[in-house]
């Protein structure tokens, strides 16, 4: 298990991009993952770091509740994006062109390239994920795999 306290200390005052899977683990209270995510979520809530994500995360998060017509979950997810909790990046031309470059040069899946590009264009120092491909292939940002912090 990695040193959570040291990582949180390094992230203080920084912009941290949350990949979709981190928010899924928290919203779904996913066993074996949520405990590794909550300290980062708490740090954003306490204002010790700035939590960021991309608009595409909203689309990814809404798929499951839309399939099941779960209005409560849809409302909860939308409120996360409507409030001041996370800074949400639009996917503009600059970030999409960078995503294409990352896809072409680093072999990332397009969705992962879009997330990574949004984080880079949004001046995030860290990207928090549990996606092995991003962890192994993304360059241009420090990728932090929450798997290192699981109990």
PLM features: residue spans?
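Conserved glycosyltransferase catalytic-site signature
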Residues: 20, 55, 112-116
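A short, flexible beta-alpha/helix-coil linker loop
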Residues: 22-24, 58, 96
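Short loop/helix-cap segments at secondary-structure boundaries that form the rim of catalytic
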Residues: 134-141
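Short, well-structured N-terminal submotif of metal-dependent ribonuclease cores
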Residues: 1-53, 66-79, 132, 144, ...
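Active-site neighborhoods of divalent-metal-dependent phosphate/nucleic-acid chemistry enzymes
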Residues: 2-5, 86-132
């Amino acid at each position: 298990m990695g040193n959570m306290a040291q990582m949180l200390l390094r992230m203080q005052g920084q912009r941290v991009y949350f990949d979709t899977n981190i928010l899924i683990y928290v919203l779904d209270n996913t066993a074996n993952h949520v405990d590794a995510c909550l300290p980062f979520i708490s740090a954003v809530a306490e204002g010790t770091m700035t939590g960021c994500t991309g608009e595409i995360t909203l689309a990814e998060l809404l798929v499951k509740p839309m399939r099941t017509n779960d209005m409560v979950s849809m409302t909860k997810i939308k409120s996360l994006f409507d409030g001041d909790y996370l800074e949400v990046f639009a996917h503009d031309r600059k970030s999409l062109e960078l995503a294409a470059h990352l896809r072409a040069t680093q072999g990332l899946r397009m969705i992962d390239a879009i997330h990574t590009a949004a984080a880079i264009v949004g001046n995030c120092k860290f990207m928090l994920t549990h996606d092995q491909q991003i962890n192994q292939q993304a360059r241009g940002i420090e990728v932090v795999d929450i798997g290192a912090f699981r109990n």
